[in-house]
Amino acid sequence: MGKAKFERSKPHVNIGTIGHVDHGKTTLTAAITITMHNRYGTGGAVAFDMIDKAPEERERGITISTAHVEYETDKRHYAHVDCPGHADYVKNMITGAAQMDGAILVCSAADGPMPQTREHILLSRQVGVPYIVVFLNKCDMVDDEELLELVEMEVRDLLNMYEFPGDDTPVIMGSALKALEDPAGPWGDKIVELFDAIDTWIPEPVRDTDKPFLMPVEDVFSITGRGTVATGRIERGIVKVQEEISLVGLSEAPRKLVVTGVEMFRKLLDQGQAGDNVGILLRGIQRDEIERGQVLAKTGSIQPHTKFMAEVYVLKKEEGGRHTPFFDGYRPQFYFRTTDVTGSIKLPEGVEMVMPGDNITMEIELISPIATEEGLRFAIREGGRTVGAGVVASIIE
């Protein structure tokens, strides 16, 4: 039996379920796979306990349990992540282990919004999950129409509070458990309705090749008579020979350079694109003027910064993290892309200290500027070991 060929005829979208513990995220994930399998004959039906026993993965030195399922609608191919525990969600969203183009917020109609409902919406805002669709679950347990409307209003208010368009967000009322029991019935229709909403509300993500060019510099050589070569893996976009690009980071202002060649596996190319490991030949710069930790990028697309707000997860002792809390003014190394930069942290007002296992919003100031933008992931390290993970939430300067 040969491996089934992966058909990439439909647009691909990454989504995930978020929401409070026991509100039905995993049941909904199982119900989606079964309903989609029944209605469209695509993907495999995945049972609840298979999703619940999610395998552990390591991302940036942090162990996270995540379940991955995939399925298709008429219009799209979806890769869907579901996490068993709240801590896994926090870690997953902050490390970007499972990048989401949009999320399904699952909220129990019987309980209404709970603390983790709020926290997952806040995390989505902080880490840059751009779109949320709401599934009000367990509606079979609520007879009172007014109560359903009340819960819907509460969820919409919560979305508005964290700068999501709460008034316009699609809210689907259903029952994951009932859909699981009878995917062909009326509760199964609600799953289809959910995906009609997702197909339209969550836009197709911009492909990596369509984004502005960026390549973190990993190594630098000089080739006699030809100039300086910077090597690395192109993170996004396309770079062409004779194009003007900028060198950003570790100095106050970006420096403009001209690409005189792109090499891959010792062959000369006209261009390099996202995912390629290349050497970029640069005119007008000496080997000692460019170093690991800087990035080559489309001019004007990214700037060097030293100060920003970040959402951070601090590793527990069992995860190889610190055994003790840290305080305001803590000075670790921040590992961005390819290099460590020292910086200091400022805790929010009223927060005395941060314990291992916490997640928190903090202000970070680096001693040298790094090419930074919202959504950029980093690790926090002490003496070469990872003690935390973070994501840039907003730039200060």
Swiss-Prot record:
Database matches in InterPro entries: EF-Tu_GTP-bd, EF-Tu_GTPase, EFTu-like_2, EFTU_2, G_TR_CS, P-loop_NTPase, Small_GTP-bd, T_Tr_GTP-bd_dom
Residues involved in GTP binding: 19-26, 82-86, 137-140
Region: G5, residue numbers: 175-177
GO MF, one example: translation elongation factor activity
Intracellular or extracellular location(s): Cytoplasm
Record-listed Mg(2+) binding positions: T26
Entry EC number(s): 3.6.5.3
Keywords carried by this UniProt record: Cytoplasm, Elongation factor, GTP-binding, Hydrolase, Magnesium, Metal-binding, Nucleotide-binding, Protein biosynthesis
Reactions that this protein is recorded to catalyse: GTP + H2O = GDP + phosphate + H(+)
Segments for region (G4): 137-140
Spans annotated as G3: 82-85
Domain tr-type G per the UniProt entry, residue ranges: 10-206
UniProt xrefs under PROSITE patterns: G_TR_1 (PS00301), G_TR_2 (PS51722)
Broad class of where this protein is predominantly found: cytoplasm
Location of region: G2: 61-65
Superkingdom of origin: Bacteria
Region: G1, residue numbers: 19-26
GO cellular component, as recorded: cytosol
Free-text function comment from the UniProt entry: GTP hydrolase that promotes the GTP-dependent binding of aminoacyl-tRNA to the A-site of ribosomes during protein biosynthesis.
Summary of subunit composition and partner proteins: Monomer.
Family assignment from sequence similarity: Belongs to the TRAFAC class translation factor GTPase superfamily. Classic translation factor GTPase family. EF-Tu/EF-1A subfamily.
Identification of the protein by name: Elongation factor Tu 1
The species this protein was found in: Alkaliphilus metalliredigens (strain QYMF)
Record gene name: tuf1
